[in-house]
């Protein structure tokens, strides 16, 4: 029996308490804001959505506590260790546990607070007593609170991101959009997150602490940093490391890298005249000197992700390196908290003799590059509804090509010209559906690199093959382990999924993208002063082509993701939670066309009320709900026993269950 089963007197009390908690998460807003019907609707949808998610998590927790009252799988290690802390045995440690004790410290605070509240309630009414509550149910409840924390932090992060992307001439405070609210609800419904809200694992609170550090980072980009904010940054970073060691890559590499870019851009001067002159320079030495001065002034090459190519990554790294060296004091002033966190982590590794705390023989850091191939199908699978527009447009384009090709009279075309036209058509299609300026041969390069990774860096951990309770066992069994050539046949699939995920993060249709000028930085005007006509047309049509991230953000996200994954020999969906959440937060919204002035009627009024509603998010919600129902059913209703070759029960006859 858990917290939400403790009050059988009235289930309505539970609902009201949880609903009130959702009000506490929402910021207090001004009266002028509340008077807006649309914003009132947004506020209601957020609270209702959060309320339903928490209710669903509570129901899931109650079902797990009823059907699986004893610790299951990794809970066998986590729950006894947490009990030791609750009993004040702080120096005892299970050598099988690899992660730091952050989860147990959070549970200690929550359980002690809950025990005090229960004792106070029982003094008033004995029916509020927590007699019969098991340690497993008590500790599992902490992850329900983690879901609430994730929801609150995701919404705040989206608010900062939208404020940063808002027009500079926008007046008044920025309030949460429908897209941010719906995105928040969907992230809490992410199947791997929602499933572990009913079990005692470290991943949810680890995600919450990373989001807390991310929210603080976004705040530092909009406010003048102070010494106390720097100290707070160190504290939040160390808190994230207390949950999971790999969080160092997000706190130091990702957030620290973004703040370095921010410090460089903040000090950039206006050099538009130099940029224009540099574009026409014929002398190589003079050109290098001009661009060096431009980069040294802080005007780095950082185009929007939607308009960037692979070549832009090279210029980005080069320009940032030059700018960082010439603006070192300013950069160090901004990122010294992250350097301090890295130093503390290095000290921990030296003291511990390694990264993991226990079971070091089974968790040896390796170079598992294939992890960076697996992440793209995983993101594409869970975020498939967000990619429907791209997939549909691609299918329609192919259909148009095929119809146009077949409509030509056969006798008007020779075999040679037909083959030539078809080849040019295919190449044109691929070029139009890659990043602007990305040459077609780079697809071959990507496929070649992926093939080498598959051949040299495919690691199958013994735990993956030995434990058929995890879905990854079946994914590997029926894919790359089925036949040796299957792993190579999956290479095009990896490449396509990568392009889809990268395209979605950019927020622009690649076939409409325009090449930007050589320099793209604050204070530097583009060489072509007139914006492309297609860009103006997109804005006039109100198409959802804006709000994407910059190239530096995408590169740093990719770097942090790679560092956090390639050091892990074991492939588990839980390891992809933080990379997916950070990616999903940055996916920009569609721009929905506003009703024309003067239009009236029920349809116009309905469009006004639902403006900002993204159909992709509705499909994403339904998709997540369907996956959650399926995994919950498999975990609860399809248990099985392990048996040896003679049919005898193994593992003392315990029931085994399917899970992520």
Swiss-Prot record:
PANTHER family: ALPHA-1,2-GLUCOSYLTRANSFERASE ALG10 (PTHR12989), DOL-P-GLC:GLC(2)MAN(9)GLCNAC(2)-PP-DOL ALPHA-1,2-GLUCOSYLTRANSFERASE-RELATED (PTHR12989:SF10)
GO molecular function: dolichyl pyrophosphate Glc2Man9GlcNAc2 alpha-1,2-glucosyltransferase activity
Biological process annotations from GO: dolichol-linked oligosaccharide biosynthetic process
GO cellular component, one term: endoplasmic reticulum membrane
Composition bias type Basic and acidic residues, residue spans: 534-546
Region feature (Disordered): 526-547
EC id: 2.4.1.256
Gene: ALG10
Protein name per UniProt: Dol-P-Glc:Glc(2)Man(9)GlcNAc(2)-PP-Dol alpha-1,2-glucosyltransferase
Function as written in the Swiss-Prot or TrEMBL entry: Dol-P-Glc:Glc(2)Man(9)GlcNAc(2)-PP-Dol alpha-1,2-glucosyltransferase that operates in the biosynthetic pathway of dolichol-linked oligosaccharides, the glycan precursors employed in protein asparagine (N)-glycosylation. The assembly of dolichol-linked oligosaccharides begins on the cytosolic side of the endoplasmic reticulum membrane and finishes in its lumen. The sequential addition of sugars to dolichol pyrophosphate produces dolichol-linked oligosaccharides containing fourteen sugars, including two GlcNAcs, nine mannoses and three glucoses.
Membrane-spanning residues: 6-26, 44-64, 135-155, 185-205, 235-255, 305-325, 338-358, 367-387, 434-454, 488-508, 551-571, 617-637
Topological relation to the membrane, as annotated: Multi-pass membrane protein
Protein keywords: Endoplasmic reticulum, Glycosyltransferase, Membrane, Transferase, Transmembrane, Transmembrane helix
Compartment annotation: Endoplasmic reticulum membrane
Catalytic activity: an alpha-D-Glc-(1->3)-alpha-D-Glc-(1->3)-alpha-D-Man-(1->2)-alpha-D-Man-(1->2)-alpha-D-Man-(1->3)-[alpha-D-Man-(1->2)-alpha-D-Man-(1->3)-[alpha-D-Man-(1->2)-alpha-D-Man-(1->6)]-alpha-D-Man-(1->6)]-beta-D-Man-(1->4)-beta-D-GlcNAc-(1->4)-alpha-D-GlcNAc-diphospho-di-trans,poly-cis-dolichol + a di-trans,poly-cis-dolichyl beta-D-glucosyl phosphate = a alpha-D-Glc-(1->2)-alpha-D-Glc-(1->3)-alpha-D-Glc-(1->3)-alpha-D-Man-(1->2)-alpha-D-Man-(1->2)-alpha-D-Man-(1->3)-[alpha-D-Man-(1->2)-alpha-D-Man-(1->3)-[alpha-D-Man-(1->2)-alpha-D-Man-(1->6)]-alpha-D-Man-(1->6)]-beta-D-Man-(1->4)-beta-D-GlcNAc-(1->4)-alpha-D-GlcNAc-diphospho-di-trans,poly-cis-dolichol + a di-trans,poly-cis-dolichyl phosphate + H(+)
Lineage of source species: Eukaryota, Fungi, Dikarya, Ascomycota, Pezizomycotina
Top-rank lineage group of the source organism: Eukaryota
Pathway: Protein modification; protein glycosylation
Family statement drawn from the similarity comment of this UniProt entry: Belongs to the ALG10 glucosyltransferase family.
Organism: Pyricularia oryzae (strain 70-15 / ATCC MYA-4617 / FGSC 8958) (Rice blast fungus)
InterPro entries attached to this UniProt entry: Alg10
């Amino acid at each position: 029996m858990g917290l939400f089963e403790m009050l059988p007197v009235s289930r309505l009390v539970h609902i009201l308490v949880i609903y009130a908690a959702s009000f506490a998460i929402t910021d207090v807003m001004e009266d002028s804001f509340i008077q807006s019907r649309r914003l009132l609707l947004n506020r209601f949808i957020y609270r209702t959505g959060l309320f339903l998610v928490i209710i669903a998590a509570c129901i899931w927790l109650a079902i797990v506590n009823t059907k699986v009252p004893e610790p299951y799988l990794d809970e066998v290690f986590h729950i006894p260790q947490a009990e030791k802390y609750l009993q004040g045995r702080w120096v005892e440690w299970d050598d099988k546990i690899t992660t730091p004790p952050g989860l147990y410290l959070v549970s200690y605070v929550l359980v002690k607070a809950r025990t005090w509240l229960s004792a106070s309630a029982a003094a008033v009414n004995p029916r509020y007593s927590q007699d019969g509550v098991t340690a497993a149910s008590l500790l599992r409840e902490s992850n329900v609170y983690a879901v609430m924390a994730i929801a609150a932090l995701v919404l705040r992060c989206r608010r900062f991101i939208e404020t940063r992307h808002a027009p500079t001439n926008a007046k008044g405070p920025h309030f949460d959009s429908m897209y941010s609210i719906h995105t928040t609800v969907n992230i809490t419904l992410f199947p791997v997150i929602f499933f572990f809200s009913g079990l005692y694992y470290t991943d949810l609170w680890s995600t919450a602490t990373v989001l807390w550090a991310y929210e603080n980072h976004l705040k530092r980009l909009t406010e003048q940093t102070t010494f106390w904010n720097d100290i707070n940054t160190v504290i939040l970073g160390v808190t994230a490391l207390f949950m999971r060691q790999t969080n160092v890559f997000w706190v130091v590499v990702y957030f620290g890298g973004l703040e370095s870019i921010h410090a460089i851009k903040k000090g950039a001067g206006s050099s538009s005249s130099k940029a224009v002159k540099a574009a026409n320079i014929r002398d190589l030495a003079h050109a290098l000197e001009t661009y060096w001065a431009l980069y040294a002034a802080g005007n780095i090459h950082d185009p929007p992700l939607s308009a960037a190519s692979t070549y832009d990554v090279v210029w980005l790294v080069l320009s940032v390196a030059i700018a960082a060296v010439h603006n070192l004091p300013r950069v160090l002033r901004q990122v010294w908290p992250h350097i301090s966190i890295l130093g503390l982590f290095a000290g921990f590794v030296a003291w511990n003799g390694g990264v993991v705390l226990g079971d070091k023989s089974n968790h040896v850091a390796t170079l598992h590059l294939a992890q960076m191939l697996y992440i793209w199908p995983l993101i594409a699978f869970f975020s498939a509804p967000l990619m429907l527009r791209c997939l549909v447009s691609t299918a329609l384009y192919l259909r148009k090509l095929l119809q146009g090709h077949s409509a030509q009279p056969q006798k008007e075309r020779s075999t040679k010209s037909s083959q030539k036209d078809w080849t040019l058509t295919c190449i044109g299609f691929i070029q139009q559906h890659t990043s602007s300026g990305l040459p077609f041969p780079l697809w071959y390069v990507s496929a070649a690199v992926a093939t080498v990774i598959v051949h040299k860096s495919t690691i199958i951990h013994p735990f993956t093959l030995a434990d058929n309770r995890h879905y990854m066992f079946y994914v590997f069994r029926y894919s790359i382990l089925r036949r040796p050539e299957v792993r190579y046949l999956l290479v095009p699939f990896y490449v396509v999924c990568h392009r889809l995920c990268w395209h979605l993060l950019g927020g622009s249709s690649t076939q409409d993208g325009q090449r930007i000028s050589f320099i793209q930085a604050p204070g530097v005007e583009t060489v072509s002063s007139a914006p492309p006509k297609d860009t103006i047309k997109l804005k006039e049509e109100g198409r959802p082509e804006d709000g994407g991230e910059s190239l530096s953000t995408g590169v740093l996200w990719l770097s942090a993701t790679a560092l956090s994954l390639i050091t892990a020999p074991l492939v588990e969906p839980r390891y992809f939670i933080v990379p997916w959440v950070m990616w999903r937060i940055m996916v920009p919204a569609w721009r929905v066309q506003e009703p024309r002035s003067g239009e009236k009627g029920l349809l116009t009024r309905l469009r006004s009320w639902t403006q900002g509603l993204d159909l992709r998010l509705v499909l994403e919600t339904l998709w997540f709900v369907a996956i959650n129902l399926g995994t919950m059913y498999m975990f609860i209703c399809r248990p099985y026993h392990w048996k040896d070759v003679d049919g005898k029960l193994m593992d003392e006859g315990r029931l085994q269950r399917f899970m992520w």
